[in-house]
């Protein structure tokens, strides 16, 4: 059986991107092939996360809609045949690309009226998922599944850049 292809819509902030590595480690343990879309500020970090197969620049500034760009970007993703998208940010705009790309399963937490855009909507229970890493990992598992112990985020070092 081939690996399941998953698209992750990454967080915009560097700290959240580092924490998202726990999700990528969990997905990789379950034989998922992981592609990630990220803004320019955090995309370089993805080259240091070994579980990520491919990172793609999503060139939309924080708060910008740029619907035409999102639609074109989504169309370019269709040929990748993703089976699932995991949307880490809680904004309506962050869920647009997976919807427009016709990805069959679109997972994320409820927020900002995303009912049409997501079809695997999770309710956030802050007592069950108190930490951001818990929330990210929960989106990579079936709803209400018990969480495994998270791996510590670890980034690879580029030996060429060391002096």
Feature-to-residue mapping (PLM):
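Catalytic machinery of carbohydrate-active enzymes
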Residues: 1-163
């Amino acid at each position: 059986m081939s690996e399941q292809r998953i698209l992750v819509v990454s967080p915009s902030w560097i700290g959240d991107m580092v924490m998202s590595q726990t999700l990528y480690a969990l997905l990789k343990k379950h034989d998922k092939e992981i592609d990630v879309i990220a803004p320019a500020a955090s995309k370089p970090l993805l080259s240091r996360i070994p579980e990520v197969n491919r990172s793609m620049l999503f060139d939309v500034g924080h708060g910008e809609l740029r619907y035409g760009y999102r639609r074109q970007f989504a169309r370019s993703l269709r040929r990748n045949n993703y089976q699932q998208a995991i949307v880490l940010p809680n904004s309506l705009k962050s869920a647009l690309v997976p919807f427009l790309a016709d990805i069959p399963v679109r997972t994320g937490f409820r927020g900002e009226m995303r009912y049409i855009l997501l079809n695997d909507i999770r309710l956030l229970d802050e007592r069950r998922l108190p930490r951001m890493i818990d929330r990210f990992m929960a989106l990579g598992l079936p709803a209400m599944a018990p969480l495994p112990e998270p791996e510590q985020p670890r980034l690879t070092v580029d030996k060429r850049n060391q002096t």
